[in-house]
Amino acid sequence: MQRGPILRVFVAARLAVLAAAVIQGHPAMGADAAAGKAKSEACAACHGPDGNSTNPLIPSLAGQTPLYIYYQLVQFREQRRVNELMSPFAAKLTDADMKDIAAYYSGQKAAEPALPADDPRYEAGKAVVAGNHCGSCHLPTLTGQQQIPRIAGLQYDYLVKQLRGFKTGERPDIDGSMASAAQPLSDKDITDVSLYLAGLR
Amino acid sequence: MLTFTSRWCVVCLTPAAAALALAGAMAQQPVPTAPAAAPAVPPTWAQGRKPEQESLNLAPHPPGITALAPEEIPLDRIKLPEGFRIAVWASGLPNARSMTFGRNGTLFVGTRFVGSVYAVVDKGTAREVKTLLKGLHRPNGLAFKNGALYVAEVSRILRYDSIESRLDSPPEPVVVFDALPKDEAHGWKFMTLGPDGWLYFQIGSPGNILIPPVTHAQIARVDPERGVLETVVSGVRNSVGMDFHPVTRELWFTNNGRDWMGEDVPNDTLHRVTHKGMNFGFPFCHQGDLLDDEFGKGRSCQEFDAPALKLGPHVAPLGMRFYTGRQFPAEYRNNIFIAEHGSWNRTRKQGFNVSRVVLDGDGRPVKYEPFATGFLQAETFWGRPVDVQVAPDGALLVSDDVAGAIYRISYGK
C-alpha cells in the first residue's frame, strides 16, 4: 500500500521535532552550522551542496543526525573506517571542524526520494525492518538518534553496499551492533530492505 | 557475531538459538528443525524492553570516541571530601577505559570502542601518551605480569613481552588464549591478575536478560602459562571491575544488573567471592533478593549466593580497586573505590561518581558513599568514570572514556 500525503506530512513533522531534540540535546552541539557550511565546500562535490547526493554510492547527509556525521568523520580520520575518497578529506579536519560540518548537513532538508512504483519488494523490505528490529536503534521512523544514523531515504546502492559490508565485517561499526544485526540477513533481505528504506522520507 | 569457538565449550548455544529454544519451550511447541537463518533478535540493550517503555526514549549513551583538550575538562565541577584535590593527569586518550601499571611505572590504558591501547609515561611534571597498539578488537582488559602486558580482546588474550622497554616498537603478540566466545554483547573484558598468577575476567551475558549459555554470565580465569580456562563463579550478568582483597586475597567484583525491570530495580551490586563455584543468581534472581519478573518464576533467591552490597539501580559500577596506598588518611586503607559509569536505563540519571565502600574487620561493607561527584550536572554528564587505579605514590587515578582523560586524586599539600 502506498503512503498517503497525510501520513507523509505526519512523518515529516515528527522527524523535524526529533531532529530539533537531538541537536539541542547533545553537548557536541556547541557547533556552528554557518561555519560548517563554509568548511563543507570540499564535501559538496560528492555529497551535494545541500547534502543531497546524486551519486548512488555516495550517501546523502541532509537531515542526517549530527552525531552520526561527526562520529563517522572521526572514524575516517582515525583510519578505523577506510575509504579512499573520504579518508584524505577527514585526515585534515579537527574535532571542531567535524562538529560544524555535522551541524550544517544535519540542518539541511532531505530531498524527496523517488518512490518505487508498486514494487513488490517494498512490502518485503518493510517486513525485514519489522522482523530485524531496525527501529529499536534507528527509531520506528528510521530517522536515527544520536550516533545511530538516519537510514530512511538513503540511496539504494549505498545501503546495499553498507549492509553487505556489515555482514562480512568489511564495514566496521563502533559497537558491533550492526555486525550482529546483519548476520541473519540474506542478500535478498538486503536488497529488499534497501529498496524500502530508499523510498522513505 | 553469533558464533562460538568450541575448543572448551561443550554445550554451545548461540543466543539466538537459546532464545529460539526458550520461545519454543514456552509455547509448548517443537523447535523448528531447519530454519533458513537464525531469527533476528533485538539489539542487546533493547532485549526485555516492554512495549510501554518504548516511549521513555531510553537508550545507551553514545560512546566516547574523542578526547577533550585539558583546558576543556571542567574539573572545577568535581566535589571531593575535605583535603582531597583532583587534576588532569593525562589527556588525549580517546575512550580511555581499564588501567594497569607496569613494573617500571608505565600506565597502560585499554579501550572498548577505538581499538587502541595507550601507554602513559610519567615525565615528572607532564605525561607522555603513546598509542601503543591499534586495530585490536575491543582491547578493554589489561593485566601486567613478569614484564609482559596481557590484553584481553573479545575472544582472545594476547601477551606482549618486555613491553616497557619496547613502548615505541611493541613486539608481535603471543596468543595466550583464543577460544573465548565471540559475542559482541557484553563481550569486552575487564581483566586482572590474581595472586595465584591466573588472569581473571568476565564472560558477560550475551544479552540483557536471557537464559545464558553455560559458557557465559560468569567470572572465569585462565592460567597464562598453560592456557587452561576455568569458571570461578557463575550467575554474574556482566562484571566490568574486580580486584583481590589485599589481606584476605579474596576476589571482589562489581556487577551490572539487568535493564527494563524498573527505574529503581534491580540494584547493581558488589560481590565477595569466598569460594570457587558460587552462583550469584543471574538470570533468575537479581541483587540477592529480587526474582526476575520473567525468569524468576518457580525459583527462589535462596538458591543463590547474595551480593555483599547493593549499589543503587543502573549506576553501572565498572572498575573497582582496594585502596592500598599510604597517601590518603588511615581510614581509607583497604577501602574499595568504585568507578560508576552512570545510568542510561533510568529517566533520572544516577551514578556518574567515584564511590567509596568501607569494610569492617570481617569484610562486611559498613559504609557506601560518594567520593568524587560532579561528572553529572543537571541531568547532563560531561565525563564518565570507568576505572580506578592506585598509583605508586598513593594517589588515585580515574579514567574517563568520554573526556578521554586520566585524573589524579591526591590528598594533602
Language-model regions: role of each:
Chain B
Residues 92, 102, 145, 194-196, ...:
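Structural WD40 beta-propeller signal
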Residues 32-81, 188, 206-208, 214-217, ...:
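Beta-propeller domain segments
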Residues 112, 154-156, 162, 204-206, ...:
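Short loop/turn segments immediately following the C-termini of beta-strands
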Residues 106-110, 148-151, 198-202, 250-254, ...:
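Conserved beta-propeller blade signature
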Residues 129, 138, 143, 155-194, ...:
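Asp-box/WD-like beta-propeller blade repeats and closely related beta-sheet repeat scaffolds
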Residues 88-93, 130-135, 176-183, 231-235, ...:
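Surface loop/turn motifs at the tips and blade-to-blade linkers of beta-strand repeat domains
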Residues 99, 142, 191, 239-242, ...:
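Hydrophobic core register within WD40 beta-propeller blades
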Residues 389-413:
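Blade-level signature of beta-propeller repeat domains, shared across WD40, Kelch, NHL, RCC1
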